[in-house]
Amino acid sequence: MGRHAHPELTMHTISLAEYMKPIESGAGWKPVAELMLRSAETLKRAGADFLICPDNTIHEALPFVLPRSPLPWLHIAEEVGKEAKRRGFRKLGITGTKFLVSGPVYPEKLEQMGIAYLRPTREQQEQVNTIIFDELVRGQQTPESLFYFEQVIESFKIQGCDAVVLGCTELPLLVNENESPLPALDSTRTLARAALQHALAG
C-alpha cells in the first residue's frame, strides 16, 4: 500500500461491563459468546472480511462463537505462539487476568505448537488481577505494582521461561520489554500486526 494508506477498519465495542457480568458471576462463556456474535454480525454488515478481538480473556468463549460466526477470527494466543516460535522462545510465562491465566486459552494453543508454558501461582494470579482491574483499567500505575509484576516475571525466569506473555491489553501500560526481566510478548500488538498482514495478504 502507498503513503498514508491502510486497510479499512471497522470497530464494534460492547461495554466491558456487559462482558464482565457473566464472567464474574460464573454464568459461563455462552453469554459472552452471544455478545461476540452480536458484534460479528454487526461487523459483517459493515463489510468486514475477518475479525479480531484484543481482549485475551474472552477468547475462552471462541469455541462457542466459531461454529456460528459469519466471519473467520484470528486467535490472539495462536498469533502469540507464532511470534514466540519466530523468535525462538520455548517456554512462556503467562500473565493476564485471573480468568485468563487459570483457563485454557493459551495452554491449548501453545501445546498444539509444542511450546511449554507456566502459570503464575494462585496468589500471583489474584494480585495481578487486582492490579489490572483496580489500577490499570482506571489509568493508574504505581511503583509498587510495577515492582510486584517484575517479581512475577522474575519468578518465571528462575523457573526456566525465556519470555513472558503480556496477556492483557493493559499490562503494557505497566511494563515494557526494556523494563521486563524477560523478553515480553505484547499480545495486543502481536495480534494487530497479524491482522495487518492478514488484511494485506487478502
What are these regions (language model features)?
Residues 1-202:
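Non-catalytic structural scaffold of enzyme domains
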